[in-house]
């Protein structure tokens, strides 16, 4: 990242190490993925997993996956922006080889263009990440009230630094699957590169719908499977194992079906393996 001493070769080395990890997982990684028994739980490196007798295995799995996601983004925060924004040759090469040349900058521009420049309502940005794509737009909406939420405190800290001094913006830590917010609280919900990481996607769709006002806009972009074999391989064998992405993932048809059940007036597009859209509740 510019200003943090993260070079192009370091980005490439990071990606290569991730690929190697897919073929040669460490003993620790194998242990941390085994959560079927109390013994395996004690071997796990998850910090916030409580050792309780629980008949619902999905509760334990969700807690484990949430911690895995938090730790994954903490370990990668120094190269996160650089890879997404394709600031150098190596990150552009990575996007061309593994993501069919999809430009996240262009998709971010299209997503944010759904929000008028004179917007003065309420916005929920979840997950805000580091605010690398939204900083300029959110800062310009002086008459709006914007809530930026992320599960990762490390990502949130970077977003807070970027958005510091914007009195109309507040940053909060939280879980998209259990939003501590009133029903119909927001005019617009934005979710950029989030749903492919959320461990409980059903809850995320339900909660974002719940806090959105009638006639409100749900605007998002994220990975969908079935568009590129090499991208699907990367996601399934590396990103999911590292905790950056969390299965299950939707195909285009499955995602369209979900949105059609919840929303109307859907403007839906696909660029490579990324879907982006704007829906009206």
Spell out what each predicted region is:
Residues 188-200:
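A short SAM/SAH-binding and catalytic strip from SAM-dependent methyltransferases
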Residues 177-189:
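A short acidic, Gly/Pro-enriched loop at the edge of an enzyme's catalytic core
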Residues 202-214:
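A short glycine-rich, Lys/Arg-flanked "PGG" loop and its adjoining helix->strand segment in the class I
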Residues 246-262:
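Short alpha-helix
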Residues 122-178:
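Class I SAM-dependent methyltransferase SAM/SAH-binding core
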Residues 62-117, 132-136, 155, 219-241:
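Conserved class I S-adenosyl-L-methionine
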Residues 262-281:
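Core SAM-dependent methyltransferase catalytic element
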